[in-house]
Amino acid sequence: MTQLPGLLDTEAIRKDFPILDRQLHDGRKLVYLDNAATSQKPRQVLDALSEYYERHNANVHRGVHVLAEEATALYEGARDKVAAFINAPSRDEVIFTKNASESLNLVANMLGWADEPYRVDHETEIVITEMEHHSNIVPWQLLAQRTGAKLKWFGLTDDGRLDLSNIDEIITEKTKIVSFVLVSNILGTVNPVEAIVRRAQEVGALVCIDASQAAPHMPLDVQALQADFVAFTGHKMCAPTGIGVLWGRQELLEDLPPFLGGGEMIETVSMSSSTYAPAPHKFEAGTPPVAQAVGMGAAIDYLSAIGMDKILAHEHAITEYAVKRLSEVPDLRIIGPATAEERGAAISFVLGDIHPHDVGQVLDEQGIAVRVGHHCARPVCLRYGIPATTRASFYLYSTPAEIDALVDGLEHVRNFFG
C-alpha cells in the first residue's frame, strides 16, 4: 500500500461514511472521485438530521412551545458554528441560503437595487474571470443586462492561471464589484486573492469571493481574505444539500436592501409600506432550511474535530500523487496547473481523442465515479478548445489506492477504445 506524508487515518475516517462501503457492478467497491460535485456525508451528520426530525422538528423563531425553541436554538447554533468556522467578526454577518448560487445571486441583486455608493448602473463596471462557475457568471450577466453596466473579465494563461498582466486596465475607477473564485472547480487553480483584493481596494470596488471549492478543503478566514462577501455551499463539505452561506461585512448588510420579501425578514408591515429586520434575517425570507443548517453545523463539528489544516495536508498529498500518476498515462493531458502547487483537490483531463463521456461511462463500469462535461464552466473549455473534460476530485477520505484504481481504469479505457 502506497504511503504518503501528511495522510490522515483514512481507514478510520472511511468508517464514518457508510456509502463508501457500497458495492457496485459485479461487486466492485465504490471509488468515489466526484467530490467537487458533492461530498459524501458522515454518519455524524446523518444522525444529527435524524435526531432533529425525530425530536426537535418545528418552525423557527417566534414560537413559544418547546419544539420551536429547540429548533430555533439548533438553527441559530448552526449560525454560530459557521461564524466560528470562517472567523467571522459577528454571527450576524452569516446569511443562510440554499446554495452558493443563491448566495451569489443575492449579492448581485442587492447591488442592483442598492442606493449609492453601492448601486450598479450603466456608468459602472462589473469584473469577473474566465474560470468562473456559471453561478458566478450568469448573475452578473443578468445584472449587466438589467442595469446597462459593463461586464469585464480576466482571461486565462495556457497553464490554467489567471492572467493578471492587465489588472489595472480591468479593475478601474468605474469598477463597482469584483467577483471571483478562490479555487477553480474545473482547473483546480488556487487564485492570488491578495493581488486582486489590493487592486479592488485601490479603486474602491467591492470584492465577492466564491469559496465553494475552498471551504471544504482548507482553513477559511474571511477577515484574512479582506473580501466584502464570501459565498460557499454546504453539500460539498459533508453537509446536506439545500444549505449555503453568504458572509458579508456588517456595515454593508446594514446598508444594502433585501432581495426576497416575505415572512421573518420584516420588522413591521402595513398595507402601504414595510420595514425590515436587521441582518441576517433581512436576507432570509420565509421558512429557512432548518434541518439543513443543523446538518451543516454537524458537518462543521466533524471537519473541525479532524482539523482543516490536516485535511488540506492530506488532500495536497493525494493531489500530488494523482498528478504524478496521471502524468504517466499515455495521451492524457491535464487541463490546468501541471503540478500540485497552488492547486486544489480537483484534476480535469482529456484522454487522447476519447470523449470524456465515454471515459466516464467505462470508469463507472469499474465502480469509479468521476464527473464528465464542462462542469458548469463552459468558458474554460472554450478557452482551451475542448468540448469537455473528465474530472477526478478528492476529499479527506480519498486514498492513494483510489488513485491507483483510477489510473488502472484509464488504462482499461485506452484498451477498450484502442
Predicted regions and their residues:
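Pyridoxal 5′-phosphate
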Residues: 1-418
